[in-house]
């Protein structure tokens, strides 16, 4: 139901919700919420502070009482404070959707569809175990918990990870035909989102800021940010591609295409990091490894374009050798 705020267009023509779409006061508050916070952040806050994920009434109460929730207030981070400031609008919108029968609508119309996707998706215990073993090994001293993250299939069009290690995902990624058509892979997305749990230091983020003096990096970074990506996304992409290739979920052609096509090929640090990941030491975190690439001059302002071309040439050569 929380995600329905961002995806209200999916339900606005359904009879029990159509009156809300015609309510100017409701739509004004809904637009205020959606202009200032994403569904993923709302879900993350709710999950982080013990919200009941199976009861819509509890959800409404949580956001209604949010300004007086001391556990939330003392957290004192910008994204949390932003949601607290918006809580009156959020609670009124959720209350209206809930009162219109969202729980019954979800049980009768949405859950059967999501269950169908889940039950028909082919995935083996062996594949899941291989993924978790590879991620645990890759995480080095951080040691990502070997226990599996909870996976929630929501009526949304994207995917995101919650801070409690839950993974929220669109059912479209479980459509085998769409996977084939658009070269998607639910399990690669699962790896990607879980890798966002790895810590990135302020020191490393500062080095990214300093890299904006490099024309080639800056031009591509601006493209990435235009897609709401960029920053440390290149780290995660490099790590996911490395792990997926290692466990056989990507071949050399898939590796090349990911770097050329993902976010219009703008994550130019990703292939640079990728080709050096075999040098990552077992007891070294991804953060410390990338810092080492900065410290030894592999990644530095004025040299990104040359290193990117070198990396892509190596990736392309591996792809062509495979095709021979």
Predicted regions and their residues:
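Active-site recognition of the HExxH zinc-binding catalytic motif
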Residues: 184-205
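An active-site-proximal "capping" alpha-helix that borders the catalytic cofactor pocket
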Residues: 131-138, 230-245
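Pan-zinc metallopeptidase signature
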Residues: 240-242, 248-324
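Post-HEXXH active-site segment of zinc metalloproteases
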Residues: 201-228
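Active-site scaffold of zinc-dependent metalloenzymes
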Residues: 72-78, 132-133, 148-184
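Auxiliary, metal-adjacent structural segments of Zn-dependent hydrolase domains
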Residues: 106-164
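Soluble non-cytosolic domains of exported or imported proteins
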Residues: 122-129, 181, 185, 189, ...
């Amino acid at each position: 139901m929380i995600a329905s705020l961002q995806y209200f267009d999916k339900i606005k023509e359904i009879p029990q919700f159509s009156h809300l779409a015609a309510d100017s006061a409701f739509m004004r508050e809904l637009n205020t919420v959606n202009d200032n916070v994403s569904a993923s952040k709302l879900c993350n806050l709710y999950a982080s502070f013990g919200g009941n994920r199976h009861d819509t009434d509890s959800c409404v109460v949580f956001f209604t009482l949010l300004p007086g929730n001391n556990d939330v207030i003392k957290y004192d981070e910008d994204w949390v404070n932003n949601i607290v400031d918006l809580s009156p609008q959020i609670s009124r919108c959720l209350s209206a959707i809930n009162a219109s029968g969202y729980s019954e609508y979800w049980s009768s119309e949405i859950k059967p569809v999501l269950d169908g996707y889940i039950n028909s998706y082919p995935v083996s215990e062996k594949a899941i175990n291989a993924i978790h073993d590879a991620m645990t090994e890759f995480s080095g001293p951080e040691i990502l918990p070997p226990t599996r993250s909870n996976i929630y299939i929501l009526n949304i069009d994207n995917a995101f990870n919650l801070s409690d290690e839950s993974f929220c995902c669109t059912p479209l990624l479980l459509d085998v035909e769409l996977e084939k058509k658009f070269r998607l892979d639910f399990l690669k997305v699962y790896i990607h989102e879980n890798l966002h749990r790895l810590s990135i230091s302020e020191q490393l983020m500062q080095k990214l800021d300093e890299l904006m003096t490099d024309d080639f990096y800056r031009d591509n970074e601006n493209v990435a940010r235009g897609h709401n990506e960029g920053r440390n996304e290149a780290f995660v992409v490099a790590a996911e591609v490395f792990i997926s290739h290692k466990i056989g979920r990507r071949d050399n052609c898939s590796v090349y295409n990911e770097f050329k096509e993902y976010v219009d090929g703008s994550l130019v640090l990703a292939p640079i990091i990728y080709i050096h990941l075999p040098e990552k030491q077992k007891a070294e975190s991804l953060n410390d490894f990338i810092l080492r690439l900065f410290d030894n001059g592999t990644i530095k302002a004025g040299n990104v374009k040359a290193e990117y071309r070198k990396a892509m040439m190596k990736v392309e050569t591996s792809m062509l050798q495979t095709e021979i």
